[in-house]
Amino acid sequence: MNASEFDQYKVDHLFLLIGENPLPNYVAARLLLNKGGTPYLVYTTGTKDPAERLQTILSNEPIGLKTAQLVPLNDYESDAYHIKEAIRPKLEAINVGKIGLNYTGGTKAMAVHAYRAVFSQHPDTVFSYLDPRKLEMCIDREDGDRIRLKVKPDVLQVKLAKLFQIHGLELKENFTQEAQLPELATALAQVFKDENKTKQWFDWYFNVFCEEARKKKNENWDDWKSKTKLAPLSISLEKLPSEVKTEFKQNNLIDPSGQLSLQEVQQLKTIEQEPVFKEIKDFCKYLDGLWLEHYVLKQVKNIAEKNSIKYYGLNFKVPLPGTQQGFEFDAAFTRGYQLFAISVSTTSKRELCKLKLFEAYLRARQMGGDEARVALVCCTNEPDTLKAEMALLDDKKIAVFGKDDLVDLSKKIEEWIKQADKDAR
């Protein structure tokens, strides 16, 4: 279903019932309002903030909408009389133009009473609902079956930053869209496929690299050493898997004595001649596990164009009231308006993997609603067992990729997307 197939259902005045998740309201406004049309945001005491936020966002959309009119119901979301009285003056003020009511966001009682209030005065109103399971805009009719319009990715592409903005969340900093040292990340993914090489990597990382570069506190690893102490370090590569050593060499990180030179890390540059790592400790963090996040980003980028993925990124840090750290999506992309969130960890520890997946699931549902999909990329040997243990979650909405999936991860992510499409049929 392309955008032109929505045209016959577009209106000049669209009443939207605002829910706790304003994303469906935003989608409905973008798909069903004519250029220069007017949104009417019908909200309760509990959804006042999302309504006011959506009013601001819609005013800045490229289709030149008129400023959204706010229609407060206060605490009367299930009171037929008050809903009718709130909507009636708005309807009476409309002299020209087609009218629509989209009741995706409201409670069932709100939807019923709003429908009756509008239908009694304007029976030719376009009544609609966004079905989150099937990704369809449904047009309800009194004289026939519901018309279903598939909201394909190319019909409406929602930026990740816009998705956060719709929920009143401002990113702490710009998210990453270019993978750091993707070839090194690929080499490490190859290493993790082999159990012996994985052990070899961890032996080198903990017993050689961390011993040189990291502080210890109560016999446990603490923060990285200071820049002045890290810069002069040359670290033995004797026990390192050859694939990783080759990538260090390709990036000119090996000194004449054949050791890893942390001084050379500062010379790494992007295509734009910007430093790959702001500080040496950022390279240390990369080896500590961030490499897998960058590997995931590269795999998403590899399949983006042919899968209608326009917006993707890494490290979405969001401040959250009442918390010190807020929350973070490791990786995410939107396909149309559907959010795909990916939690990433190099751990194989079952409980930690489950915790990361559960946290990502909750945040993704909060951001992307029922349409959101969530995956965990980790180093477990048993991804299917791990997924089965997450019985509380809707298994159609989650995926778990283990270490055997890493080498073919772009293909696995593509299959995940296709499965999401299949589930929406």
Stretch-by-stretch model annotation:
Residues M1-K98, V112-F327, R335-L339, T347-R350, ...:
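Long, low-complexity, Lys/Arg-enriched
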Residues K98-T104:
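Short glycine-rich phosphate-binding loop at a beta-alpha junction
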Residues G105-M110:
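Trp/Phe/Arg-rich N-terminal binding region typifying the photolyase-homology
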Residues I342:
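Conserved beta3 VAIK motif of the Hanks protein kinase fold
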